Amino acid sequence: MRECLHERALLLKNAPELVRLQPFFIPVYKDSVRRPWLLRAGLIFYSLLGGAGQDTRFRRVPHCEWATLDGLKTTGLQTVFQYQDAQTDDAALTRAVMASAQALGAQLKTQSTFIAASGPENRQKDHWQIRYRQHEQEHTCTANIIVNAAGPWANDVLARIATTAKPVAVELVQGTHLVLDGKLEQGIYYLQSPRDQRPVFAMPWQLTGEAEASAILLGTTETRFTGNPAVVHPLPAEQEYLVETYRYYFSATPKIRAAFAGLRVLPMPDDKNENKSENQYAARQRETVLQTDCANLPRLLTIYGGKLTAYRATAEKVLQKLQNSLPDKAPVADTRTLPLKRPV
């Protein structure tokens, strides 16, 4: 958490067009599993890890303000905590990072499919020979180092590389989000499903082409996924689960404008108990595993897991792992201070 709070502070400073602080509300009801004292202790810890700065402080929302909380159910409501966290459009942030890298000299091959990589036989001199397909044409290129950052496809990509590196056992966890009609004026709400007490967030959402937040983003679910990541899609049961949670706290039956699903990569726990309930995924540590083909002179690194907030810190760790294999060059920029602009 400390790392994510540090990286959040950098993003707020370097990418104000893309990342902004939002008030988060945690309502606590008589039947809530997490009691007020426990949440308060957690928020104190959160504030201390963030240096007790203005952006990590929290408060109890006075009873007289409850009526302003976007129609939040007040029956049985005991207290409401408010704290701050950052919100971004993940696709826009990713495009901004890509554009920044390109401006600094990176070559991007989008809409391409990795086919295979062979070599290098001599770790000191040879290069990887890479084959890829772009616009129905096969191409080749060479590389001193391969970083496999293929997310849920990481082990599929690794299997196409001529290497002795072993794959890391992972679980793929599907998360579905719904885009709902409506507006949330006050901020983001941390809700707990009445069915299994899993966290679900309801937040203001800006649709593509619109100047301000005009919808609600609701999510997410956690469903074990097997199969081809390319065909992941929202399940009817997931949509029902999310709508049920929203109605429990806001009464109205929302109109679903859109739904989408993605996959998280979780390294397998030591206890591979197949009967564990799905809501235990929420409690699992979302660690990032960096697997190399050798310790001393790595030429291949695969990334498993990770969080968007810490993408820059993860990249620094990747470079540290690969430093013995990289040429001795002066950096062209410092990502701790490099501005990120919203892509046009």
Which residue stretches match the model-derived regions?
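Short beta-strand segments that buttress and anchor functional surface loops
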Residues: 82-83, 130-134
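A conserved short coil-to-beta-strand element within the FAD-binding core of flavoproteins
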Residues: 110-129
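Flavin (primarily FAD) cofactor-binding/catalytic cores of flavoenzymes
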Residues: 100-103, 112
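Core beta-strand elements of the Rossmann-like FAD/NAD(P) dinucleotide-binding domain
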Residues: 136-145, 149
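Dinucleotide-binding Rossmann-like beta1-alpha1 core, especially the glycine-rich loop
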Residues: 1-68, 199
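Short linear elements at protein peripheries
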Residues: 43-99
